[in-house]
């Protein structure tokens, strides 16, 4: 893994790290730094210590990737040997820059997702929509920071809604983001503008996420999203701005009763009225809230939750 792709403080010569090898046919797991079965490999406090990382550098911390695309079509128009011909030349640019050792800024112009893995085909027999996982690189980085109240089942920010309208792809004109950590505060901000099409006007998508870590495994955070539709074609009805604000709290410990896991999570989300029918609605009708106690241990586990 090239060092220039990682955010780290070059003054620190010791890193926490862990490795795991899984042998399925033997149902066997081999760990470099062991951990209790209740905790798992992804907890930083279970990592081993890798020392001797001296004189390493991120370089300039600048990455520039461009692309070019040429398309052509030749379609018979039904008049003998005559054809309708069409040609299109397109291009775009992606720029990433490490502002500090823990903060990264990115810019994308005329974004292309041609190399993105396609979704797996699924059959949905329920009345609820399927949430396909995000696979586009621009939206994948920092996804863990944007994750809101992970066990609540509430998604005030879902990146797959950007660049897609009623199953139809919408081209992205440009986008910018800042992702990283300032002290103990995790910071993520994203701004994306989509192109006007035959069925939707140009739109701006904005999202800001701040998460403060405290104690060893706990955090409190705030999330704000905004979707603004520009005025465009007269036959497309104008839409009000859609604003959402969310707060979430996560209290976790892996030392309950010495070596047990105990988790508590609470959240609240509210959005503004976006249609004439919602203007007179109460705050309760435009909000969601909930809490959850979880005791995820082996062999005994249990949970208690409330949500409305």
PLM-predicted stretches and their roles:
Residues 1-74, 78-308:
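Outer-membrane beta-barrel channel domains
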